[in-house]
Regions:
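Terminal alpha-helical segments
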Residues: 1-116
Length: 116
């Protein structure tokens, strides 16, 4: 059905951004290989001393919320606008993050304390 395709599109939009960012971050610092990695990527971006990273982090948070609704709330309708908006947000977030330096990503990682 079309709604099933729209729900899938919302999820793919989230994972496109998440995987792009995860790959950029994990070359700088190993990331957990479990579900915690999703929150950690958002935490790095949201706490970064960089407005562009903060913006990308907020977009990733928004896309994750939309994905969770699309995947788990079957009573919620996912229309063309939601699907298109998710794809547009994902495209913009990836483009914005491509312009962010490795040094800015490293600074984002270093803001959070490391626990042993």
């Amino acid at each position: 059905s079309l709604e099933r395709e729209r729900r899938t599109s919302v999820g793919r939009s989230y994972y496109a951004v998440f995987n792009h960012l995860r790959l950029r971050l994990e070359v700088l610092k190993p990331l957990p290989m479990n579900a915690d990695v999703h929150a950690l990527v958002v935490k790095y971006l949201s706490n970064a001393p960089n407005r562009e990273l903060n913006s990308v982090g907020q977009t990733l948070r928004d896309l994750r919320a939309a994905r969770n609704t699309a995947d788990y709330d079957l009573a919620a309708m996912v229309d063309d606008k939601q699907s298109s908006t998710s794809m547009l947000k994902a495209d913009r977030a990836i483009k914005k993050s491509q312009g962010i330096s490795e040094a800015a990503l490293r600074a984002a990682i270093n803001v959070l304390p490391t626990y042993h």
